[in-house]
Amino acid sequence: MQFKRLSDLIARGELQGKRVFIRADLNVPQDSTGNITEDTRIRASVPAIQQALQAGAAVMVTSHLGRPVEGEFKPADTLAPIAQRLSELLGQPVALKQNWVDGVDVAPGQVVLLENCRVNKGEKKNDDALAQKIAALCDVYVNDAFGTAHRAEATTHGIAKYAPVACAGPLLAAELDALGKALGEPASPLVAIVAGSKVSTKLTILKTLADKVDNLIVGGGIANTFMLAAGLKIGKSLAEADLLGDAKAIIDMMAKRGASVPIPVDVVCAKEFAPTAAATVKDVADVADDDMILDIGPKTAELLARQIAQAGTIVWNGPVGVFEFDQFANGTKTLAYAIAESKGFSVAGGGDTLAAIAKYDIGDKIDYISTGGGAFLEFLEGKTLPAVAILEERAQG
């Protein structure tokens, strides 16, 4: 992927005295009184802002927060708590500007936060007139919001068409570099772990990866559907009978090119889905009609851990069992530690995956943890991300 980078512009001294517009992802969770409960995204936005300030730029930053109604600003939509947190992290004042589309006063060395961009009429529809107005505010546009890269909106796509210069910030660039390395030019064998409750939500990803990977490890409800497709009994476990044909096609497609979807040899079952449910390890042939499969068994976990240990590249999206309940967490825990210890290049993403990484404290052992949510999944699906495509287009001239 070829795109301009903020770091290159800074290295060439091209930000001195310039007006820089940074689209960040500051969409953080808040409690009922508006206090920020988790500030990872705000902290992740700081390097781009600091780099631009140190390079002598006048810096404007914006983001969406929640799902406001366009043209109807409500107190709950405000970025005020974020301005305060940014100010603490940067060690300098961060003024919050409202009604900013028609002009912003900011001097070199200063940073201002522009109020919730999704309140502007036309933002979500990528309105061309709005995009041109916003682009006129700056000399350099920086997209540092991978989490919204799959959406074509006025501050993620339209502005990049019209700003004099459009580039990727450090967060976006690192994300694209890591995902490009994992899927564009992967060291083999390439192992993907795709887990979740439903095949239907991840069918496109499964089909795309089935073309690329050496081992496609499935977990959760997805694995149950694949077990059914392989002719195994799954009791009363969650599965999608209408997608058996798709699961069979993926198994056959991979087998034809010497790749595999490893089907579990043992599983952890319970009679009910509850935090106190009794867990029983069973060989797959012994699953009873009233059993629910809630994790892969220890033999399966060990076999998969060996495949992960030999991998050149690992892409991880989803825990393989109900890891929130400790008695059904062994599969996810075993694979998490195998990924952490593997010498292969590892990329992980998705909310539940991030929760598992936090639970087993392996964040520093994963090569790249994607903050992207929906954008990460669309990248895995092989889709073009509009916000990235426009940066590539601008880089070509």
Curated annotation (Swiss-Prot):
Protein's UniProt keywords contain Metal-binding: no
Residues that hold ATP according to the record: K202, E324, G350, G351, D352, T353
InterPro entries: Phosphoglycerate_kinase, Phosphoglycerate_kinase_CS, Phosphoglycerate_kinase_N, Phosphoglycerate_kinase_sf
Localization per Swiss-Prot or TrEMBL: Cytoplasm
Annotated GO CC locations: cytosol
Pathway the protein acts in: Carbohydrate degradation; glycolysis; pyruvate from D-glyceraldehyde 3-phosphate: step 2/5
Enzyme class: transferase
Domain of life (superkingdom): Bacteria
EC number: 2.7.2.3
Keywords annotated in UniProt: ATP-binding, Cytoplasm, Glycolysis, Kinase, Nucleotide-binding, Transferase
Reaction equation(s) it catalyzes: (2R)-3-phosphoglycerate + ATP = (2R)-3-phospho-glyceroyl phosphate + ADP
A molecular function GO annotation: phosphoglycerate kinase activity
A GO biological process held by the record: glycolytic process
A matching Pfam family: PGK
Residues at which substrate binds: D25, L26, N27, R41, H64, L65, G66, R67, R118, R151
Family named by the database record: Belongs to the phosphoglycerate kinase family.
PANTHER family, per the entry: PHOSPHOGLYCERATE KINASE, PHOSPHOGLYCERATE KINASE 1, CHLOROPLASTIC-RELATED
HAMAP family according to UniProt: Phosphoglyc_kinase
Oligomer and partners: Monomer.
Protein name as annotated: Phosphoglycerate kinase
Species in which this protein is naturally found: Janthinobacterium sp. (strain Marseille) (Minibacterium massiliensis)
